[in-house]
C-alpha cells in the first residue's frame, strides 16, 4: 500500500502539513471472506512547524506503522501549544503533541476540559539558555550582570526562577529582554543580548546555521542544572480516549516503533522528514535530530524504565519548580495530568 502525503495551507499564517495515510481495506490472507475492519481516522496536531524532532511521527506514517495498527492519521499544525490543546479539548483534534507543562497551565483553569497526557516523548524538557562565549558566558553563573533574551510566549522561562535559585543566581542580577520569536537568533548573533532562552535543539542549531561559530556557542541545558521538567507529550481528547481506547494504544505503539527507527538510523529518518518540510537542510535537521535523541529522548531514565511514562516523584518535584513562577490554583499531581493506562508494558517500551 502506498503512503501519500498531502500538503495544504491553513487559513492562518501558519502552514499546515497534512500527513494522510491512504489505506485500502482488503481480505485477511488465509481467512475466507473475512474483511479487515475499517481503519480508525485520527486527527493529530503538532504545536509547531514540522522539523526533524518530529521524526517518530513521520516515520510512523512513511514506514507504514500507523497503517499496521489500522489507523488513518491526518496531521495538522497548530499556531502554538495553546491552540493545539484547545483543538484537543474541543474535539477538533483527537491527539496532539504539546509541552506537558503547558498542559498543566491549561488544566489549572476552573473550566478546563479534563485533557490528559498519555505518552511522554521528551523525557527531559529541551529548555536551555544559549549564549556566546565571546560575550563572557560559559557557565550558568556567568549570567549575573548579563542580559538574557526571552521570546514572547516562550514558556520555558517559567522554570528560570527555580533554576536560578537552585544554582545560587540572584534573579535581579540578570536583566530579561523580551522580543518576538522571529528575532531571537538575530539578537544573539548581532550581540544585542548576551544569551537567549529557548529550546536547545532549535535555537542552538539555528544559530550554527546562521553562521555563528560552533565553538563560540554555549548551550546551558536546564536539565543539566537541576531542572526536573518533562517535555513534549501526547495528549488525547477525553471522549476519543473513552470511545476508542484501542486506537489510542495503537497510535502509541506506532510512535514507539517510529522512535526506535529514528534512533537506529537518524540519517535515514531525516531523509523521510525532509520530504515533508519547507526549506529544511539535511545537515541542520540531522544535527537537530541527533541532539534531541541524545539530550531529550534517550535518557538514562528511559534506558532503565522505557519510553513514554513518568515518575510521579519526579513529576511532583517538577511541579514545585514550576510553582516558583506559576501560581497554581491547586498544584497538580501526576494522575491529574497523566494517564498511563494506554501505555504498553514497560518491557515493550524499552529503547537502548
Where are each of the predicted segments found?
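Short, glycine-/small- and polar/acidic-enriched structural segments
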Residues: 35-190, 194-201, 220-222, 227
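Bacterial N-terminal signal peptides
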Residues: 13-28
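Secondary-structure end/capping motifs
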Residues: 243-325
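Signal peptide processing junction and immediate N-terminal pro/mature segment
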Residues: 27-36
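Conserved C-terminal helix/tail region of periplasmic/extracytoplasmic solute-binding proteins
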Residues: 315-352
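A bilobed periplasmic-binding-protein/Venus flytrap-type ligand-binding module shared by bacterial periplasmic
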Residues: 59, 127-137, 229-247, 303
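Sec-exported extracytoplasmic/periplasmic mature domains
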Residues: 62, 89-90, 108-111, 165-169, ...
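N-terminal secretory signal peptides that target proteins for export/translocation
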Residues: 1-12
